[in-house]
């Protein structure tokens, strides 16, 4: 509204204004005098005075808590317009379809689809690529200054793909690759040697390869076509590579040396040992393989000294810190490798020993050692630990001290004493029988067994010259050996005549207690 008013002129000047009222739609010509606080309105068309009212200022209008319906509707319309503008702005950055061309009914036209990148999605993608690519000007659009910050992916008339794009494959010609799944642990760097057939020489080269694929086993190319390679399940992927020394690499910390036959070790005993020693010379990070497996296929029988060759390989594996696994078929060898690959990331809790706590009745380490001896239970182990201060005193005690403990009878004392005093390695004992007579005696040992109850020597006849010992039972419990040679005939139960008859009944008693 425009008005002109002069303070010096007493006669007010009138101006003609056109005002539109949204409620009553009445147009009037008013002569208005505007002040900051009060406003006076006069109507020039009619001489009738009107009711005087005060027009509130902008600050007073904002202080009012209740607004009129007109103001509310205007604000809602303004918000809708802002939202529509923001939506149109995002639609311009989304997938745009060109309109169909108007053709006749006989011809068919297909829409030309042009995919354009979305700024909100590209901001979240951090893909490291080695090659330099040129970015399109649409990929870096200015930020959207609108109240709606949710990204608009595609209009309602565009059909989204039913299945997602495969991993590590580009979505379109102008978009980068999708980020691959996280792999744990990371890639493994190693230096391998490659063989050149033209120059007949080896050359070392550093290659970075990720051995942590979920279902992939890296095999030596020499294993191609073997029966074991055809025995893996369909879930395992075999990738052949030029590995000179290890035959298989299961992951970044597990490698396998495979001996396909014991006959190879029999003909060349140093072959597998030289291959294992050559591993550290070609692979810079060979120490990172914490699990090293020596897989052996035993194809020899017992008559061909199969056990002897396995013992030799076991000593080689212990010296070189390898784990020896013996299989009896190539299918079984494939199952072992597949099991190692399948249970690679599994926790070892199912195969760990679950020791019961001592508070709940479990055994301590000292009790486990003592109860490993036969006839010693947990109560006896507790008694020994209470009466002796250290384990050294327990293993150096005497029979008299053990017999004083509660629960230790003569038999238990003797068994425990024999166990803690016997050597770790026993040599086969050769016993000979001698007599005081001038005639030589022939002894034939048929069966030797250890018995803790009785000592029996059974002879076939009563002749002291030819005694055949059929059963010898050694006892260390109650009886002692009589070393007096004069009582030899009496100990045999004889009467001095050499017939073995002690009571004169004509029968020979062939029993001796030593």
Swiss-Prot record:
GO molecular function annotation: damaged DNA binding; single-stranded DNA binding; single-stranded DNA endodeoxyribonuclease activity
Transmembrane region(s): none
> SUPFAM superfamilies, from UniProt?
Restriction endonuclease-like, RuvA domain 2-like
What keywords tag this UniProt record? Answer: DNA damage, DNA repair, DNA-binding, Endonuclease, Hydrolase, Nuclease, Nucleus
Question: Which GO cellular component terms are attached?
Answer: ERCC4-ERCC1 complex; nucleotide-excision repair factor 1 complex
Q: Which InterPro entries match?
A: ERCC1-like_central_dom, ERCC1/RAD10/SWI10, Restrct_endonuc-II-like, RuvA_2-like
Compartments where found: Nucleus
Residues covered by region (Disordered): 1-52, 426-514
GO biological process terms on file: double-strand break repair; mitotic recombination; nucleotide-excision repair; UV-damage excision repair
**Gene3D superfamilies for the chain:** 3.40.50.10130, 5' to 3' exonuclease, C-terminal subdomain
The family database entries (CDD domains) matched by this protein are listed as: ERCC1_C-like
Where are the compositionally biased (Low complexity) regions?
1-47, 429-476
Q: Does the keyword Lyase apply?
A: no
Asked if the Swiss-Prot or TrEMBL record annotates the protein with the keyword Nuclease, the reply is yes
Q: What does this protein do?
A: Structure-specific DNA repair endonuclease responsible for the 5'-incision during DNA repair.
What family name appears in the similarity comment? Belongs to the ERCC1/RAD10/SWI10 family.
Quaternary assembly: Heterodimer composed of ercc1 and xpf/errc4.
What's the protein here called? Answer: DNA excision repair protein ERCC-1
Species source reads: Dictyostelium discoideum (Social amoeba)
Q: Which gene encodes it?
A: ercc1
